[in-house]
Amino acid sequence: MANATSFEQWKDAAQTLDALENKSSWKENIASDVYNYDLLSDRLILLKKLKDQNDIEGLYRALREGLHHDLGNMGDIRLYQQCHFGTKTLIENYVTEVCSCLDYVCDNNLNDLTPAKKLDLFKDILLSFGRPALLLSGGASLGVFHIGVVKALWEQGL
């Protein structure tokens, strides 16, 4: 991983190392004292069901109810120290489904959801999660490292 020249190379190396160290069993086992896996599992099932049933009003309510950056303690640092890449599969699946539902709400012309109501939802999301910022400190002595960080973020479209 130390010799990777791009995020993709680093990611591939990290995932390979996780496989060699048999980290997949930890990732696949949803149970943990660190986070509320029952809450996330139930919400994941609910979001999928509402989207599949095209229940726009229900999906809207469910998304608004879940506007917490640390829902079920899924942001606990201990969940991100076990593997070189990623965390519990349940958390990854939940985040992916929330993004999918938000894309669905954003990209579709939904009769039950006016543009104003959509805008309110996304404004509330902005208030809950804020705007990401990148602070590069350390002056010229760390400038070379900063260039690498910025390059990797740029290559990932971030």
Label each region the model flagged.
Residues 1-158:
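Patatin-like phospholipase
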